[in-house]
Swiss-Prot record:
Organism: Escherichia coli (strain K12)
Name used for this protein in its record: Multidrug resistance protein MdtH
Cellular localization per UniProt: Cell inner membrane
UniProt xrefs under CDD domains: MFS_MdtH_MDR_like (cd17329)
Parts of the chain that traverse the membrane: 13-33, 99-116, 139-159, 165-185, 214-234, 244-264, 277-297, 300-320, 340-360, 368-388
Length: 402
């Protein structure tokens, strides 16, 4: 085995272990934020939505800067520093009794993610061969689902005692992850050339096709982020107990572990990436619309199952499509910018979703936020369809001219 192949194989195992630690640390804390501050402390959902949206926007919106800096200085220092900042954010969250302190803790957490998330994504693109990326992204998603359940179960159990224990556990896991990277991650370069920060950012901004695709995905993310805000609140309201939230993540884990990899393997042989992304988004959108009308836990979990199936179909295709569009000369910058759709959609989804949830509750129209999210998903589906048809038309024109 050549040294390059050996490095790739070792890199795969490193990425999987690193991802599990990050997912555990995140899901111990974040699914329980809405339960803690909305249900236990009586805050308005929009206040918590602002906190979650701030974290999302900071982490993903500034991702291009984190990626560009990593292109220049390498992945290791950015990842280690970012994970320590995330740990500090969780520690601060444990003592938050005022909205401004919760917002500050989410700001710290988001800045940490800005530093470590783009270089970690770029390492996947660097180490995994193009023809294997779809399957590897599916493995990461399966791991995400299992880690989400374990983290949510652990967090729910700790929440019975004290929310500070929840946050302390998340902080410790990120400190361990920082130590793991500091000890074992080689000083790998992310890009084929040592790209200056400004040049990497400029290269991305000139790629109009990539920019349009990323911004359109904001609508997709407005739906996706509700697993952290409105879906846990809805499950808690219908079940009457916060412990039911863990079953929501258990459903995701079961579906992901049984369906994600087989669906990815089968669909990559029969369907284009664009079609898989659009089909998944359509299922997610249609499953969102009736959520506000259900009154039983069984009906709610059925709709959540459909939503997760849509995500299982769409997410590996979205990741693979984003990676395939990235320029190898500025991988960090591209993978950082690819998070901008998540920044915009996540922020609007959290803040707007929280506001609509409060509005629907006060107006006795609980279906309002869910119908709006479904409509946004349908419009995003149509916008992506138009973009992909334009791209195919341009490709046919080039082939004819040749």
């Amino acid at each position: 085995m050549s040294r390059v192949s050996q490095a790739r194989n070792l890199g795969k195992y490193f990425l999987l272990i690193d991802n599990m630690l990050v997912v555990l640390g995140f899901f111990v804390v974040f699914p329980l934020i809405s339960i803690r501050f909305v249900d236990q402390m009586g805050w308005a959902a929009v206040m918590v939505g602002i906190a979650l949206g701030l974290r999302q926007f900071i982490q993903q919106g500034l991702g291009i800067f984190g990626g560009a800096i990593a292109d220049r200085f390498g992945a290791k220092p950015m990842i280690v520093t970012g994970m320590l900042m995330r740990a500090a954010g969780f520690a601060t969250m444990g003592i938050a009794h005022e909205p401004w302190l919760l917002w500050f803790s989410c700001l710290l957490s988001g800045l940490g993610g800005t530093l470590f998330d783009p270089p970690r994504s770029a390492l996947v693109v660097k180490l995994i061969r193009p023809q294997q990326r779809g399957r590897f992204f599916s493995l990461l998603m399966m791991q995400d689902s299992a880690g989400a359940v374990i983290g949510a179960l652990l967090g729910s159990w700790l929440l019975q005692y004290d929310f500070r224990l929840v946050c302390a556990t998340g902080a410790v896991l990120f400190v361990l992850c920082a130590a793991f990277n500091a000890w074992l991650l080689p000083a790998w370069k992310l890009s084929t050339v040592r790209t200056p920060v400004r040049e990497g950012m400029t290269r991305v901004m000139r790629d109009k096709r990539f920019v349009t695709y990323v911004l359109t995905l904001a609508g997709y993310y407005m739906l996706a982020v509700q697993v952290m805000l409105m879906l846990p609140i809805m499950v808690n309201d219908v079940a009457g107990a916060p412990s039911a939230v863990k079953w929501m993540y258990a459903i995701e884990a079961c579906l992901s572990l049984t369906l994600l990899y087989p669906i990815a393997r089968w669909s990559e042989k029969h369907f284009r990436l664009e079609h898989r992304l659009m089909a998944g988004l359509l299922i997610m959108s249609l499953s969102m619309m009736p959520v506000g009308m259900v009154s039983g836990l069984q009906q709610l979990f059925t709709l959540i199952c459909l939503f997760y199936i849509g995500s299982i179909i769409a997410e590996p295709a979205r990741e693979t499509l984003s990676a395939s569009l990235a320029d190898a000369r500025a991988r960090g910058s591209y993978m950082g910018f690819s998070r901008l759709g998540l920044a915009i959609g996540g922020a609007i989804g959290y803040i707007g979703g929280g506001w609509l949830f409060d509005l629907g509750k006060s107006a006795h129209q609980p279906e309002l936020p869910w119908m709006m999210l479904g409509i946004i998903g349908i419009f995003t589906f149509l916008a992506l369809g138009w973009q992909f048809s334009q791209k195919r038309a341009a490709r046919r024109l080039l082939e004819r001219d040749a």
